Swiss-Prot record:
Keywords: Cytoplasm, Hypusine, Initiation factor, Protein biosynthesis
Annotated gene: eIF5A
Matching InterPro entries: IF5A-like, IF5A-like_N, NA-bd_OB-fold, Rib_uL2_dom2, Trans_elong_IF5A_hypusine_site, Transl_elong_IF5A_arc, Transl_elong_IF5A_C, Translation_prot_SH3-like_sf
A GO biological process held by the record: positive regulation of translational elongation
Superkingdom of source: Archaea
Molecular-function annotations in GO: ribosome binding; RNA binding; translation elongation factor activity; translation initiation factor activity
Protein name in the entry: Translation initiation factor 5A
Main location: cytoplasm
Compartment annotation: Cytoplasm
Species assigned in the record: Methanococcus aeolicus (strain ATCC BAA-1280 / DSM 17508 / OCM 812 / Nankai-3)
Stated family: Belongs to the eIF-5A family.
PANTHER family, alphabetized: TRANSLATION INITIATION FACTOR 5A FAMILY MEMBER
Length: 131
């Protein structure tokens, strides 16, 4: 999957990111079982989606590989609000993006600076920096 890198499941920790069923997620719970008589150690991950509020679970051996999304955090200025879309200008590259209006971020207005991230080709506003 583009925009990801493979890592071993055993190296992941709570709070890190993983792609489960092509959905980028943040790990919220993780349990490791010890190796037994008939096999290696297993990991059970519980994760919440970054873009949709969905709960995902994954079980696998600690030596198996999983994709981790490459997350790019950036700052931008709100140019306009068009219904449920926010038009943002990136403050480094001056590119213009249209990002869905977040539900969990306080009131957003034109001219505000916001922090957003890009993962697996999708964007999300995370917080308002200045008003």
């Amino acid at each position: 999957m583009p925009g990801t890198k493979p890592v071993e499941l055993g190296s992941l920790k709570v709070g890190q990111y993983i792609v489960i069923d092509e959905v980028p997620c943040r790990i919220v719970d993780m349990t490791k079982s010890k190796p037994g008589k008939h096999g290696g150690a297993k990991i059970r991950l519980t994760a919440m989606g970054l873009f949709e509020n969905v709960k995902k679970e994954h079980v696998g051996p600690t030596s198996s590989r999983a994709d981790v999304p490459l997350i790019d955090k950036r700052k931008g200025q709100v140019l306009s609000i068009m219904g449920d879309l926010v038009q943002i200008m990136d403050l480094e590259t001056f590119d213009t993006l249209e990002i869905p209006m977040p539900e969990d971020v306080e009131e957003i207005d034109s001219g505000m600076e916001v922090e957003y991230f890009e993962a697996v080709g999708r964007y999300k506003i995370t917080r308002v920096i200045s008003k």
